[in-house]
A protein has these predicted regions:
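Intrinsically disordered, low-complexity boundary segments flanking structured domains
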Residues: 1, 5-9, 70, 88, ...
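Short, well-ordered beta-strand elements within core beta-sheets of diverse protein domains
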Residues: 29, 47-50, 161-162
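Active-site-adjacent loop/helix segments that line or gate small-molecule/cofactor pockets in enzymes
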Residues: 1-26, 67, 81-82
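Glycine-rich loop-to-alpha-helix module at the N-terminal edge of alpha/beta enzyme cores
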Residues: 8, 37-123
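Short secondary-structure boundary/capping elements
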Residues: 22, 53, 81, 163-166
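Active-site and channel-lining beta-strand-loop segments
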Residues: 19-42
Length: 175
C-alpha cells in the first residue's frame, strides 16, 4: 500500500525507484515494514557519513529542538551552533579563507559554487563531468553528466562543457 501510494503520488528522482517501505533505520541499515534489513547504499549526506540515528546526532537534535528548530540560515542571525562550526572550519582552512557559506543541501552548495566560480574568475564558462550528479535545481542540472535526466528541462545554463573523469586530455577543454 505505501509503495503503491509512493509510486502514484510522489515525484521520482530515478526511472526505477527502489520503493522500499521504510519502517526504521539504524547505522548502515534500513529496515522495511516487513522487517527485512537492507544495507543502505543510497543514504543521504548525514546518514552516509555517520549512519542512521547516530546517538550523538539524535542527542544533539533533541537538545537543540528544546531551544529552537530553525531561524533564518543565511547570515541574518547569530546562532551559536552555526558560528562555532564556521569558526572551527576556518581554523582548518588556508589563511586566505575567511568565511563559510552555509547551505541546507548539496544542490544549494552547487548553486553557490557556480556563482562563486563566475565571480572569482570573471568568466561564464562552467565545467561538469560526464556521469556526474549534482542535484536537481536548474544550475545543478546544467552540470549533470547524465543526459537522460536533464533532456526534458532544456535549455539549461549556457557555456557548459563536460569532461571525463581521469582524462588529462579533457583538462585542456577548460579555458
Amino acid at each position: 500500500m505505501l509503495k503503491d501510494d509512493f509510486l502514484k503520488y510522489q515525484a521520482k528522482t530515478t526511472p526505477n525507484p527502489l520503493g522500499i517501505s521504510v519502517a526504521k533505520a539504524k547505522g548502515v541499515y534500513i529496515t522495511d515494514t516487513n522487517g527485512k534489513k537492507y544495507l543502505d547504499f543510497v543514504s543521504g549526506v548525514s546518514a552516509c557519513s555517520l549512519g542512521h540515528c547516530h546517538p550523538k546526532v539524535t542527542r544533539a537534535i533533541r537538545k537543540q529542538s528544546k531551544k529552537y528548530l530553525h531561524v533564518m540560515v543565511y547570515g541574518e542571525f547569530a546562532q551559536a551552533p552555526a558560528v562555532n562550526l564556521c569558526k572551527e572550519l576556518i581554523e582548518l582552512l588556508p589563511e586566505n579563507q575567511e568565511s563559510v557559506y552555509l547551505t541546507n543541501s548539496g544542490t544549494e552548495a552547487i548553486e553557490g559554487a557556480l556563482k562563486l566560480a563566475k565571480r572569482a574568475t570573471g568568466r561564464s564558462e562552467l565545467i561538469g563531468a560526464h556521469q556526474s550528479y549534482h542535484g536537481s535545481t536548474h544550475g545543478a542540472l546544467s552540470l549533470l553528466g547524465l543526459e537522460y535526466q536533464k533532456t526534458r528541462f532544456r535549455p539549461l545554463l549556457p557555456d557548459t562543457r563536460f569532461i571525463r573523469f581521469n582524462s588529462e586530455d579533457d583538462l585542456k577543454l577548460i579555458t
